[in-house]
Regions:
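N-terminal pre-P-loop "Q-motif" helix
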Residues: 75-103
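SF2 helicase/translocase NTPase motor core
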Residues: 4-14, 26, 31-77, 102-106, ...
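The Walker A (P-loop) glycine that initiates the GxxxxGKT/S ATP-binding motif of P-loop NTPases
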Residues: 109
Length: 213
């Protein structure tokens, strides 16, 4: 077959494989044992049967720093599925790597899961743990309004969100506590005097920074 025909056949084979995959409704069983009042996610969430066969890690609410407010749980400001992300992130952040760095958490949820609100939920939990400085990195400067909305949606309207470029690169941001919003492109930029935005951000965070990044 020609290259075009080969690609068409490959695409058809892939479609047939996808049709054969079995999907199951996802339920955060481990979380519900610790937070029985958690609400269902507003949209239907599924996972393929292979993933469903793998047991999720135990939720350790007692060991990890979990300070999620009752209002967030009982009013469904975060669904059970989103709360699960906040809890697993907190558990992961409790670990320290061999080089002394705090362990990170990767969120691979697909479209419609409310990832922005999940990130806001992680900040909400850390804020209530006493960590008052956080950095939100995004692809677009316009998404700062989404970050503000997401924090408001998890009952944190008083957390101030400011853009890093509200200040000149040579100046340390005067935001004492809150979320500093920065885009990837701004993060690698310099001003006309050669001052780097990354250095500016590092100065704001300080050596004792323990917030979300």
């Amino acid at each position: 077959p020609s290259p075009k025909q080969a690609r068409a056949e490959e695409a058809q084979d892939m479609e047939e494989e996808i049709e054969q995959v079995e999907f199951q409704t996802y339920v955060p069983h481990k979380l519900l044992k610790s937070m029985p009042d958690a609400k269902e996610h507003p949209d239907k969430v599924v996972e393929n049967a292979t993933l469903a066969a793998v047991e999720s890690p135990d939720v350790d609410v007692e060991r990890a720093e979990i300070r999620i407010s009752k209002k967030v749980v009982e009013q469904g400001l975060l669904s059970g599925l989103q709360l699960e992300t906040v809890v697993y992130a907190a558990m992961r952040h409790e670990k320290t790597l061999a080089n002394g760095s705090r362990a990170g958490f990767a969120l691979w949820d697909g479209a419609g899961m409310g990832k922005g609100r999940q990130l806001a939920g992680i900040i909400h939990n850390n804020w209530r743990c006493g960590r008052k400085k956080h950095v939100w990195v995004s692809i677009s400067a316009d998404l700062i309004e989404d970050a503000r909305r997401d924090l408001k949606d998890v009952n944190e309207p008083k957390i101030e969100v400011r853009a890093l470029n509200d200040w000149k690169a040579s100046k340390k941001p005067t935001l004492k506590e809150g979320v500093l919003f920065v885009t990837y492109s701004l993060l690698i930029s310099k001003d006309s005097d050669g001052k780097r935005r990354l250095d500016q951000l590092a100065k704001w965070c300080g050596k004792d920074f323990d917030g979300c990044l």
